[in-house]
């Protein structure tokens, strides 16, 4: 092929001023084939990089967003400027309009400057990931990374726009393309080279030196997993090789540009045309190298490349799978946003409907310990401190109260009702006539038509008092009459089936306040028959159901007949034995009751629940 003359048309190109250089035909053919290969590898390789990042979840990270951006920048020259270069090489000159020449120069500038700026962004991303790993997630979040990407391309456009003046981008017959005419303004040319090439090289070099120092300092097999360390080193090497190849490919043309811009008259005739051609083609060839480097050095990219190659055998399935992957990714993002929104709404509703803290009001009840609590192994009862109210105990009281038999009393026929209590009983014949019962450390509740006592002490004046500890299924206890005029101090024992009188005297309790009639309402009588001593002569002897106790009975034989020979003790033994088996483990404390029946012939059955919060009478 002979030398191609410049097109004699007013296109304002360098070819109109400079003659077309005479290249050997073999060199023209070689350059043409190399450019075709560059275009094919550029388009296919960078497309595969974009598909690999899109399809592989391991490659979907903020750092690879700049890798995709770099692939897009490399593809720009393969779409428009390189095909027009092939056209100029085939005809031996430029026969297109000046507008197309300006577009070729502008797109070429976007590709070159965009590539170097994206390489800088990749280096900064790797630097933050390795040297500032704690702040990496905050600095390079998805939102921030997208903002950085937009800023990168805005800077690229702003850097290329000054070259769009008419006359600065012209056709160069030595390279068969439209480039920036550095002969028109040498100062501007040096400034562009420093901003577009030298400064990015310094930034990227600093980042990779720091990264390499950090990697060498962290190469401790005992402190880090060797596999993770090797992966980081390979990732670093991949990015470093890409930077190194870019610097090597674009360094010759930038050096020639600066030399010609500084001394155009001296250097213009000394630089051969083939050197210009080789420098430009090396720079163009860099656009297809990035995809090859990813496939050679990055295992994830290499594996995804093989997947794409195998899928290319069935294009329909491949593109349908790609579309489905994109839809799944969009659905996953939508679902993630919906879940986050629902979670935020649930938290707001929980805060709005949060129940206030339950405040427990302490009971104003003076706890008086029962005698023998400390000896029986109940220090909490003997200490006098109330137990905290709990829902479990309330539930127990509620369930236990449903099984309890109502407390009843038999009044004598003459009176028909109980006489109200008015202080202590009057002492007669030197014997105490008051009955003092120390309640357990809680308020005393009388079940079923009875009075609720909350005083420090409770004084009873019935003929006899019987205590039965409550269980989960309490058994009824039938009250019995005690003959009038008898008085005794009875101590209940598990060893005997009936109480025996004792001659001991108990001094009435004086340390507690004496209740009055106003403190204790008049109890209601029950619907049971009211037997008297005349109707039931067998009840003249004092006896009660056998309740297990702790101490042995000691009684006075002169006042009461022998209970063992009493005929009334016979019918009570079966009930007592059954009650003893049910309550021997539940009776907490020995209870001593002093009774006197000078004025009343009533019998009161007291039902005591073995509950830490109440005692039912």
UniProtKB/Swiss-Prot annotation:
PANTHER family: B2 BRADYKININ RECEPTOR/ANGIOTENSIN II RECEPTOR, MELATONIN-RELATED RECEPTOR. InterPro entries: GPCR_Rhodpsn (IPR000276), GPCR_Rhodpsn_7TM (IPR017452), Mel_rcpt_1X (IPR002280), Melatonin_rcpt (IPR000025). Residues 341-353 have a biased composition (Basic and acidic residues). The record marks 408-409 as: Cleavage. Disulfide bonds join 101-178. Belongs to the G-protein coupled receptor 1 family. It is a multi-pass membrane protein. Residues 340-438, 464-596 are annotated as: Disordered. Residues 485-500 have a biased composition (Polar residues). Cleaved by CAPN1 in a calcium-dependent manner. G protein-coupled receptor that plays a role in numerous physiological processes including regulation of energy metabolism, neurite outgrowth or cell migration. Promotes self-renewal and neuronal differentiation of neural progenitor cells through activation of the NOTCH and WNT/beta-catenin signaling pathways. Modulates the KAT5-dependent glucocorticoid receptor signaling by modulating KAT5 subcellular compartmentalisation. Residues 1-30, 86-103, 165-188, 261-273 are extracellular. It is found in: Cell membrane; Postsynaptic density. PROSITE patterns: G_PROTEIN_RECEP_F1_1, G_PROTEIN_RECEP_F1_2. GO terms for cellular component: nucleoplasm; plasma membrane; postsynaptic density. GO terms for molecular function: G protein-coupled receptor activity; melatonin receptor activity. Hypothalamus and pituitary. This is Melatonin-related receptor. Induction: By TGFB. The chain crosses the membrane at residues 31-51, 65-85, 104-124, 144-164, 189-209, 240-260, 274-294.
């Amino acid at each position: 092929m002979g030398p191609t003359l410049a097109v004699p048309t007013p296109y304002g190109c360098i070819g109109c001023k400079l003659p077309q250089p005479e290249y050997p035909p073999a060199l023209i053919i070689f350059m043409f084939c190399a450019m075709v290969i560059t275009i094919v590898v550029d388009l296919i390789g960078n497309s595969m990089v974009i598909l690999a990042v899109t399809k592989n979840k391991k490659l979907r990270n903020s750092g690879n967003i700049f890798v995709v951006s770099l692939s897009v920048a490399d593809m720009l020259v393969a779409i428009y400027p390189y095909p027009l270069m092939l056209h100029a090489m085939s005809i031996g000159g430029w026969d297109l309009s000046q507008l197309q020449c300006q577009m070729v120069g502008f797109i070429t500038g976007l590709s070159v400057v965009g590539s170097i700026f994206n390489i800088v962004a990749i280096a900064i991303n790797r630097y933050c990931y390795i040297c500032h790993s704690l702040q990496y997630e905050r600095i390079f979040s998805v939102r921030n990374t997208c903002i950085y990407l937009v800023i990168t391309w805005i800077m690229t456009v702003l850097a290329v726009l000054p070259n769009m003046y008419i006359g600065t981008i012209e056709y160069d017959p030595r390279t068969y393309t439209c480039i920036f005419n550095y002969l028109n303004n040498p100062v501007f040319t040096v400034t562009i080279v420093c901003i577009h090439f030298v400064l990015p090289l310094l930034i990227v070099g600093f980042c990779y030196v720091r990264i390499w120092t950090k990697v060498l300092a962290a190469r401790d097999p005992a402190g880090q997993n060797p596999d993770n360390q090797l992966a980081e080193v390979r990732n670093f090497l991949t990015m470093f090789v890409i930077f190194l190849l870019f610097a090597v490919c674009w360094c010759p043309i930038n050096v020639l540009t600066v030399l010609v811009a500084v001394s155009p008259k001296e250097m213009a005739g000394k630089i051969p045309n083939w050197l210009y051609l080789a420098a430009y083609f090396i720079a163009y060839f860099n656009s297809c190298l990035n995809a090859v480097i990813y496939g050679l050095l990055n295992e994830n990219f290499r594996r995804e490349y093989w997947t794409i190659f195998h899928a290319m055998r069935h294009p329909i399935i491949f593109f349908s799978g790609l579309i489905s992957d994109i839809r799944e990714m969009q659905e996953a993002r939508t679902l993630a946003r919906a879940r986050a929104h629902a979670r935020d709404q649930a938290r707001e509703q929980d805060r709005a409907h949060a129940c206030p803290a339950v405040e427990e009001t302490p009971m104003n009840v003076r706890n008086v310990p029962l005698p023998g609590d400390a000896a029986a192994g109940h220090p909490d009862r003997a200490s006098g401190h109330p137990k905290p109210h709990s829902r479990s105990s309330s539930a127990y009281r509620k369930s236990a109260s449903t099984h309890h038999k109502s407390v009843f009393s038999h009044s004598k026929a003459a009176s028909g009702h109980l006489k109200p209590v008015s202080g202590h009983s009057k002492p007669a014949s030197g014997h105490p006539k008051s009955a003092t019962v120390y309640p357990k450390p809680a308020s005393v509740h009388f079940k079923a038509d009875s009075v609720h006592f909350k005083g420090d002490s409770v004084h009873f004046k019935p003929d006899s008092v019987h205590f039965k500890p409550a269980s989960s299924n309490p058994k009824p206890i039938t009250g019995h009459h005690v003959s009038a005029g008898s008085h005794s101090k009875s101590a209940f024992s598990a060893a005997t089936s009936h109480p025996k009188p004792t001659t001991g005297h108990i001094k009435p309790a004086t340390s507690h306040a004496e209740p009055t009639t106003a403190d204790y309402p008049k109890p209601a009588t029950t619907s049971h028959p009211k037997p008297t001593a005349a109707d039931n002569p067998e009840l003249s002897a004092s006896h009660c159901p056998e309740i297990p106790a702790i101490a042995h009975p000691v009684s006075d034989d002169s006042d009461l007949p022998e209970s063992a020979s009493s005929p009334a003790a016979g019918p009570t033994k079966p009930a007592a034995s059954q009650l003893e088996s049910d309550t021997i483990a539940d009776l907490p404390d020995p209870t001593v009751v002093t009774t006197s029946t000078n004025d009343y012939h009533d019998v009161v059955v007291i039902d005591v629940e073995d509950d830490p919060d109440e005692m039912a009478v």
